[in-house]
Every structure is written in C-alpha cells, then in structure tokens.
C-alpha cells in the first residue's frame, strides 16, 4: 500500500503531518536526565571508586555535555531528524500544527512549515506557505494544493472573453491568492549568523578549537577561532547582500485602473487578483507590467528583456478575434497575447471595438490578470534565483563515504596511541584527548569551502564572457556532458537573414534557380510581401519585429507606417486589417489587407505547408524550393486569395482555416542563412573533445542537413527519414538529399538494419517520422544514431531531451530562449543565447556601475548629514547625474565627456549655481577630511569589484528559459561552460585527493610519530602552516585550457584510479618515514621512556622527520595538482608554483646543510655526511615514488573514455 501524500505540487515529493512533542519528551532532554543524575551520584557518593581524579571528572562531564549538545544540534542539521526529535506524526490534518515537506530534486531544501488556520465567513481555511507558494487544504480531495488559476486548467478562449471582472466581497480571494508582490523578508545579521553558527561544519571547527585549547595550543587555537568567525561573518554579509538584491527585483506598487463592480476604479497594483480586468498603459521608466496578463482587446509592444533576456521588442495582440470554443494555447498561437509581469510596455493601442465593458479612462489596452505574486513568470524566476543559492554544494553522499573511509585510518591510529600510551603509563584523560584529536584531524573542514570556491570561481569566469547562471549546482554537470544539442536559426546561424530574391514567379522559366529582384516581381507578389508580416512602427519611429521581415520589406521597398499601414512608391498604401500570427504548429502566418479598396488574404509559411493550401500547384514547385533548401537557403512560400468586400465585423468572424485555403501561389522568398562566426570552430572543438553534436530545428530538413554539413555536425552522405508520400498511411522513407537513394520503412513491422543504414549513412529525422515511430522498439537505437532533427515542434524538442536523459546521457541544449524553453529546462545544462553585442553590454555595465556609484554617493551624503559633516564633492564620473552647484565642481567636464556642447548660456547657469553659498555645518568634534575621504574611497571602489567572486544575479542577466544565459549571441558559450564544468570537476577530484593524503599523514603524525616523542618548534610549524595556506588559496585558481581535451575528467572519487593512487601515495610516504626513523635510531638510539610533556628541543629525529614531512606536503600538492589536459599546468599557477619551489629548495638546502645558517634558524641539528645523503635520496624517492604511482594508476585505471553516443562522432569524423 502506497503512502498518502498530503500535498499535490510538482515541487513536493512527499509530506508528513506533524504535532509538536512536549519539551520533556524530546531526545535531548528526557534521556539525559538519568545520565546527569547517575554522574551526580557517582561524583558525590562514589568519587574514589569510579572517577578517581579531576581529569576523569572533566572527561566524563565533558563527554556527557558534548553528547547532549550534539543531540540538541542535530535537528538544526537535518530536517528529518528535526521532525523525529521535535514532532510526532499524525494522519489527521485537524490535529497537525506543522507539515514536513520533501522537495523534488533541484527544487530547494526540505523543510518544516507551520500550518495556519483562519475563519472566513463562518468556514475554516487551513493553509501553509512553502518557498513563497501558498498551499490550501481541500477537504473533498483531502490534499493541500496551490491556489488554482484558470489559465492552468486548459480553459476555453471564451472563459476569458466573457469575463466581466470581479464583483462583491473579495476577502476570500485576497486570502486565497495573497498580495501581488514579492514579499522577501530580510533577517538581521545576528539572526542569519545564529543559523550559520549551528551548521555542522562551524560546530565541528569550534569543537576542534576547544580541543586544541585543552591541549594548550592557545595562540594557534584563538587565531583559528578568529578566522572561523570572520569567514562565517563574511558569508552572512554576502547572503544579506543577495537577499537585499532579490528584494529590489519586486515591482513597486503603482496606481492602475481596474474594472470591479461594473465600473473602473483606481487601485494599487499589489491589490490585483487573478481574473481582474485591468487597463494596461505604457509603463513608466522605473516600473513594469505588474503581473501575468492576457490581452483581451487592443495591442501592445513590449520589451521582455528583464524576463527572457531578449532585447528585441515584441508585438502582442489580443484574443478578441479568437474562436471562443478553442482551447487557450499559451505555448502556441496565444503566446502573442500574453503579457508577462516584470516586462515593459513600450507602446499600447487601445481597443477599437465596442464591447459590454466601457473603454478604460486612461486609454489603455484591456487585459485580464492570470497570475500574481510569486506565481508569475517573473516570480518563478526570482524563486529559482533565491532557492538556487542553497544548491552550491558537494555530493553529500560521496563526501560522507569519503570521510567514513578516512575514519577507518583515524580509528587505527587512535587505537595505537591508546595502547602505546597505556603501556607508557600516560594519564588516560590526556590519551583520550589525543585520540579525539586524531579522529577530528581526518575530517577535512576545508572540503565544502574549497569545492564551493571552485564553483564560484567558475561562475566568476563565466560572467567575464557575459554568461550567467541561476542554478550553480549544474556547473559540474557541464563537465560530464555527452550530447550537445543545438537549435539552428539564431544559434548556429545568425538571426539577420540576408534577402537574396524571389523564385518560382514565372511558370515558363526553365532555370529553376533563377532569382527575381523586386523590380521584376508582379504586383500580386509585392502586395503579399507588404501584407504578410507582423512589423509595427513605434511612436518614436523605430520598427520592431522579426529581422527577416524587416530585411524583406526593405528589399522590396515597403515602408512601415503607423496604425498597421504600409506604403510603397508606385504601389501606394496598403492597410492590414487583421492578422493571424505565425504558429509553430501550423508553420504559417496570414493577414487580411486592403489595397485600392480591394480586400485580399496574404499567407506566408513553410513551402510544404503552403503546398497543401493551394488551389493549383505550379509545376516544378517541389523542385524549386528543394533546390534552394539543399544549398542551405531559408525558403518561405507566398500565397494569396481575393476576398469579397465585407464589414469589419464579418472580417472579425472569419475562420482562419477558411482564409488560408484555396490559395493562389505568388512565389518563394529566398534568404541566405549566414553561419555565426564561431559556429564551425565550436562544433569542431566539441567533435574533437568526445562530445556528440546534434541539431534540433523546426526548419526544413534539406536546409538543416546543409547547415549541419557546413558546421561539421555531419560529414558523410545523409539519409532523411520522412513521410513517404502525401497520404496519411504512416509509411516512412529514407531518402538522400538529392533523392537518388530511397529506402522504404514501415514503422508497424520494419526494424533498422545497422549495416545498411547506421554504418553507411548519417541520419536525419523529421518531426513527422518521430510521431510515426512513437512506441517503436528501436526508437532509442535510432536516436543514438541520428545527427539532425528537422521540422520538429517545441514539444518534440522536449521529448528528445527527456529521452536522451532517460538513456543515461548527460545532455546540453543550446537555443534562443523563446521557442526552446521546454528543451532548455529539460537538459542537464540548458543555455539560452541572447542577441546582445559586447559593445552594448559594456555600455550597460558602465551604466550599472554609474548607477551604483550614484546610490553610494547618496548614502554617503546621508551619512555625512547624520554626523553633521559637510557634503562631499560629487565624483567626476557621476557629476552629470546631479544638478550644478558648489559641491559639483566637475559638472561641465562631465557634460563635455558625454558629448554635450557647452554653450555660453549653460556655462553662465553653472557659474550662477556655483556662486550660491554653501551651508557650513559644524564639524561636531570630527575632522572634515576623514569622512569625505571615506566617501571618496568607497565611491572609487564602487562597481569595480570584479574578481574571482561569483557575480550577484540581477533580473535581465538571467533568462527564465534556461539555467545558463549567454548575453552574447556567440555559440562559444557552450565550450566556455563545458570548459568551466570540467575545471570544477577536476578541482573536486584534486581536492579530495589532497585532503585525503593530508588527513592520512596527519593521523600518522599524531599517533606513531608523536608517540616517538617528535615535536616541532614554532618556526617549523609556521613554515609548514604557511605552505599549506598558500597552496590551498592557490590550488583552485588554475584556469582551464582553451582547447577542450579528448580525455574526460573522472566523474567521481570511488574508482580504482583515485582510491588506488591515494593509498599507494600514502604507502610511499609511510615507507619513507619509517625508513628515515630507522636510520635515525641507528645514530641516535630511542629513549626507553619518552617524555611526551617535555618542551621542544632540537634533535636528529625532529630534524629528519620535519624535513621529510615538508617534502611530503610538497609532493601531495605537486603530484595531485590536476593540470593538463584540462587546466593550465602547475607552472602557470604562479603563486603555487613558486611557493612549492621555495619550500622544495628549503627542504633540499636543509637536508644537504647547504646553508648552515638556515639550519640553525630552523632549529635543525648537525647531520653526518652519510645521513645527509640518505635523507636527500629519501626525499627524492618520496617525491618521485608518489609521482610514479599516481601516473601508474592514471595510465592503467583512469576511466576517461567517452560514452557510446560520443564514440560514434570519432568514428564518423575519421571517414
């Protein structure tokens, strides 16, 4: 019997209802009462029998208190433990006060939230909030779920068209949906610090500091404590800054006209509710559309850059003329009616038709609210940004297994110390402390910090290429990618298509490739081009819309005018009366237009789609368009039909299917698709680095195959699997580009022959063939051998990515962020390419920097006023942003730098402003110079903090379409992300290896070497500590190589190569230590009774062990540093390279007594010549032995082979 889940949501995997336990019943209270009571009884009544001294009192009580604190803190570390310790489970929602939520993967952390109850109109409402989403209890279904939105319920168009707005009491709806705002509470510094202070790592580090204090390492312990607290404080400040940034992403409430209770009223935008009717006007500079809406009447030009990242303004048209019985298709034909919250309306056209609802008083377009608050597109993006901050973490399961593996060695070392110490008669309390120190030494506290630093350095490196990431946990995924999928148009080819001419106009022409200019085209063709487009002219004169349509109209001579009119010299004025927007499902668009009082329909679309709508198909129709598509051109067919004169209402009632049937052919539009500059180089690099590159496009298969050959996705002869003929009998046919090879395929009974198909040809598959093959037993085999997918819909792109993931491959999808949203979200690594230029982005960055300086200057001015200090002068870079005056001496200079011509009138006005007296505020005991200098210093640093820190995400940086967003249109973003992904992976492996060896050597040093009486002096410990600090700071700074390697990084640590290398290197280190210790005892016999408490005194044992351990630390970093073929070699990491060289030089100089003064300063004792030779050779043996075993295991056991789907690329590339 399956367990019932109380919550229905895609982000919730499971849930449990909870009731709090009483304090006494909690595991950190009740079980400890008898333990404390037993200790008290033993202490006061049987002290001499059981405790026998203050040391054991401390051990027993310390262990008991530590265990109590540990159990008390466990609920703060794990939400399941918190539920177990603090709550009882129940199945009755009326009893429950809290609920435990288990989230689905990559949707934030699990959590316990309070269940709230409110009585409304006599009925009880039960709900809770989780991750800014509200969940309400539905008594009938016995489940919590988010409030239902009509837009998610597959509604009919008529459900929105008939809406008359809200009436009556809206208290219930306000409670149900909440405010239309982003309520992100900002905790105080101390609240956040308390949260960090109970984290397992922080508690463990403080516990270690306490142990070192007990062992009388005062300076070392207090310094460590200071460093730990400082690092946590810095992390808290960083989180606070990020939360404040998220808070600014909300839209400040402003007044909007809303149709409620059958009249227009002015309300604040935060009061909006779903199904409210609102008037949308041009948004103010600092504002935006307040929520998700659907246009009911009128039209708008919007800029969606703040949401999708795309800066090209889009035309949005209403659903007024859509058939009321049709289903709403938000991802299809109705996409053009959606206004997303957070976007900007640049221009609005009010409704032209009369309706039951009076026109808005502000002349805006009529729209209906679909979603509010965090449920909107912008709200979802902000939620992703907020909760992705928790996701930069190591693989917890692998890290835990790794630590358990190291603990085995720590337990063995502790057992040795206990046995040997007991034999030597050491104080047992001191022995227990030593044993605990050994066990804690193998838990590397640096591990999470180092791995997080690796991911953050990758984020910072990507930001320099204008690539931003909302889900940092995906960066290591990029290092494991098997399959790279690319859209064609706008991704591999440029957005700006070049208009080459018209084809197929004359039926008599023998040359099927003849191109006609606009001057040679008949008027009917010119009129279709002028009508079948969606370009709009803004009030400021800019024309917005598809770049391809802009190029076409410009080449033919049409000028776009206001109010859906076009004008062409010699042709006259053309008015577009109604548009049927392009649909990816229909693969065509249409318009109804009027020219010289004649009404006609103009249709434009894919040649094979238009072919089916023609009343008479011209001869050579297929030959003409296929001839151009084979050579890589983009081909669109034009068609039209005359319409009788009719009224506007009749035009509005026309059915799209009727308009687009019985058409007359008017020619083909031919465009050249230039490849992006970096497309060929990017695909070549991926092919050579064990990746499979495939193309998934909605374009024609012949064009797709041509472009795939140009960029290097396919090399050999290609067969296209498509429908066999015009009939709907589901029969398929493999045919080559020239149609000289054809192999029939019946999906109902045929199977794929590898020797005849996959071993001889590259394969391309169409969307039609994919549908026909649904459920075929060999579909996955076909996908494994397919290079190009053409004429596929957005849903099919999503299906392909999901299937490749199910087949066990790591997938990457690179698309344009508008048509490819589903596929981008399904891929392990989704990359949305936007259309920015580097120059434009630099200008935007400079603008942001100046805005930051302006805000900081205003804050500093307020700070001065609070301390009764004079206002500091305005810095020159932002002088033009403030009015002239005595405190703005650089005003004229700043205006000149911005290109303003300084007229005598401007100069006179500035002089007058500068001559005004400045109110001098009494210094109030503080010097005037210091605060002003502070302000200047802060301003100079504003906006320039670009280092190795992960950049703070802002709206407009990230696209809601994909986890990765490239603001540049460069395909090289793919290789940059893979490069950084491999770098992060390699960093992870190297950190595990280095920390493992350091911990193992530390366990050996704290046990066997310590018991032998070896102690190190302050100077020696300082040198060793500095080496480790420099190396740990430098090690993750290795930059990835420009060229992607054919080799692939290890995906995990538990394999023969990694574990074999760690254990073998450890064995080499132990062997050299044992050998040197043996040689030392020959010269300096071991004391029969070692005094472990004595002060440090130089000895041959101390000298030899310290020098060899110094070299072991060098070899640990140098041998396990992961450089080529993934990152720059160790010599390029200057800090680490010279640090290691310096320490190696110190060790060799000390071992050979090359500089006697150095040995004296380091507190080393003189050595015999024979011992110096043995010591030096042992140092070399230790280093080269470690190097040898590492390379042995790497050569024989490293699993760097590509997956089977990637191997095929190598095979075909070698044809």
From Swiss-Prot:
One of its GO terms (biological process) is protein transport. The keyword NADP does not apply. Present with 1870 molecules/cell in log phase SD medium. It comes from Saccharomyces cerevisiae (strain ATCC 204508 / S288c) (Baker's yeast). The keyword Transmembrane helix applies. Residues 1-27, 77-188, 247-395, 465-971, 1036-1055, 1122-1133, 1198-1215 are cytoplasmic. Residues 156-185, 250-390 are annotated as: A-domain. Contains a large substrate-binding pocket that recognizes alpha-helical transmembranes, which alternately faces the endoplasmic reticulum lumen and cytosol, while remaining accessible to the lipid bilayer through a lateral opening. The translocase alternates between two conformations: inward-open (E1) and outward-open (E2) states. Undergoes a series of conformational changes with ATP-binding, phosphorylation of the Asp active site and subsequent dephosphorylation in a Post-Albers cycle (i.e., E1 -> E1-ATP -> E1P-ADP -> E1P -> E2P -> E2-Pi -> E1). Mg(2+) binds at residues 487, 489, 816. Keywords: ATP-binding, Endoplasmic reticulum, Magnesium, Membrane, Metal-binding, Nucleotide-binding, Phosphoprotein, Protein transport, Translocase, Transmembrane, Transmembrane helix, Transport. This is Endoplasmic reticulum transmembrane helix translocase. InterPro entries: 2TM_P5A-ATPase, ATPase_P-typ_cyto_dom_N, ATPase_P-typ_P_site, ATPase_P-typ_TM_dom_sf, ATPase_P-typ_transduc_dom_A_sf, HAD-like_sf, HAD_sf, P-type_TPase_V. Belongs to the cation transport ATPase (P-type) (TC 3.A.3) family. Type V subfamily. One of its GO terms (molecular function) is P-type ion transporter activity. The active site is at residue 487.
